[in-house]
Amino acid sequence: MHHVRMVKLPAEASDPHALRSRARRSWLVFAAVALVLLAAGLLLARDYGRSQALAGLAGQSRIDASLKASLLRAVVERQRALPLVLADDAAIRGALLSPDRPSLDRINRKLEALATSAEAAVIYLIDRSGVAVAASNWQEPTSFVGNDYAFRDYFRLAVRDGMAEHFAMGTVSNRPGLYISRRVDGPGGPLGVIVAKLEFDGVEADWQASGKPAYVTDRRGIVLITSLPSWRFMTTKPIAEDRLAPIRESLQFGDAPLLPLPFRKIEARPDGSSTLDALLPGDSTAAFLRVETMVPSTNWRLEQLSPLKAPLAAGAREAQLLTLAALVPLLALAALLLRRRQVVAMRSAEERLARNALEASVEERTRDLRMARDRLETEIADHRQTTEKLQAVQQDLVQANRLAILGQVAAGVAHEINQPVATIRAYADNARTFLHRGQTVTAAENMESIAELTERVGAITDELRRFARKGHFAAGPTAMKEVVEGALMLLRSRFAGRMDAIRLDLPPDGLQALGNRIRLEQVLINLLQNALEAIGDSEDGAIQVRCEEAAGGIALTVADNGPGIAADVREELFTPFNTSKEDGLGLGLAISKEIVSDYGGTIEVESGPSGTTFAVNLKKA
């Protein structure tokens, strides 16, 4: 008979009602803590996501701005060549020396043709006094011929320095543009100035289509080129009145008031960019990220505004979703642990109450308890037996799976080592013959080749073992010339007398693909073997092997003039164990495709009555 010693516990620990009350309080505290954590996590995630999105947007915006600046430079550089060439033109110089009507008419037509072909807004010739004597727009109502440009900086600076570039509003056309000028010199000194005007309508249209406001400013901060026409000739910062007066008097920007750009809340960032609010046409305000870069070969600065609202919202949303994805499972786990603890405590309390209530009758129920214990031990034993049987079944399943994989590997090895083994046998027969003849040097060379081929057999079996378990050889730069030569070496003995049918274009030494030499040799051997078997003993049989660069990669092609592949066979050509040969296993092309796929390449096949072409496309190293 068993005697149970009773231990008195605190009332709260053994009272289920007290435990339930405490559990409700615990859940209220847990809910409050969870809400605080979620709120704090979402707020922090929002700020972090916005910060990361802003950094990413800044990087992309700098790339966009640099690209725009490079394209703008290309446009300007293309037009700079016109005045440079025309300044040395004999006809231009002759027209300034003898400005008669026939010579000026010829110059007008010449400039008109040049402006059309070079996409210049206008090209015009100014004499020594500053009056335009010829222009590409000589037939238009806004012709520059006869106008006095002596006050223009691009004329004065070109006469003084030989060349000048000046952005201004046209006094006749009322269209802004860049004036590129060169002095025309004669035997006695300056004869005049040739000017090409470049307008940026196409550039501005492209910028406008991008949806990101962009503009170019000069060294004074005045906007010259912009995707928003209303911002033209505005300034990035206020200009002092004593500096504004001479700019307005020069008529460089017409009657533009030169007001500051409508930017507010400008905040600089450590990376050189800044955020701001801009008033857009239509009285709408939006937040932007501003980045800037210099336009090469000019003193211009290109600034681009990237909208902030959508990227920041997306960054905050993504970070908050990730935070929820992390916090919700953790909170769920915490709730589960809390619930489990409460259930365990409640169960323990109930058990203790039941034990206290049955304390008086424990002696009478000892026998029943012993019997219950025996039944429990029996059930435990049964459970252990069931568990052992289940483990045995699981081990049988694992063993069966291993046997299936070993079957695939064995089938692959039987196919792939057939080629080098046949070559080894041929080398061995030749070595024996050479030994009988006393040609020991040649026999030794054959034995060395056999040693190399045995190493290659070991490499092939290792490769096929890895193929059967979906393994991968590390990819690296592989010389395609060595791949082609290695494959031909393996096939030379087996197909002796038929190798002359192969027409080979060896790749250059420096041509390297991304892959592994031995595995790529396997692919080429399979393709060449199929091609040699396809042409058979035909006297006019031919195989063309070519390896060259193509479409950013490397194309290795094997083409034969055999009878081609039947349509029903071609549909499942790369399916394992699918073959039309009596002694074939149907694994060669399947393995080849798997090898090429491992290195990011593809195999394509074209077949017809006149022959079959396999194309292996690989990545260039």
Curated annotation (Swiss-Prot):
The reply on keyword ATP-binding is yes
Q: What does its PTM field state?
A: Autophosphorylated.
GO molecular-function terms, A-Z: ATP binding; phosphorelay sensor kinase activity
Name the InterPro entries for this protein. Answer: HATPase_C_sf (IPR036890), His_kinase_dom (IPR005467), HisK_dim/P_dom (IPR003661), HisK_dim/P_sf (IPR036097), Sensor-like_sf (IPR029151), Sig_transdc_His_kin-like_C (IPR004358), Sig_transdc_His_kinase_DctB (IPR017055)
Residue span, Histidine kinase domain: 412-621
Query: If you read the UniProt record, what top EC class would you report for this enzyme, in one word?
Result: transferase
Q: Which GO terms describe its cellular component?
A: plasma membrane
Q: How would you describe this protein's topology in the membrane?
A: Multi-pass membrane protein
Which EC numbers characterise this protein's activity in its record? 2.7.13.3
According to the UniProt topology, which residue ranges lie Periplasmic?
46-320
Function summary? Member of the two-component regulatory system DctB/DctD involved in the transport of C4-dicarboxylates. DctB functions as a membrane-associated protein kinase that phosphorylates DctD in response to environmental signals.
Question: Per its record, how is this protein called by name?
Answer: C4-dicarboxylate transport sensor protein DctB
| Lineage per the UniProt record | Bacteria, Pseudomonadati, Pseudomonadota, Alphaproteobacteria, Hyphomicrobiales
Gene behind this protein: dctB
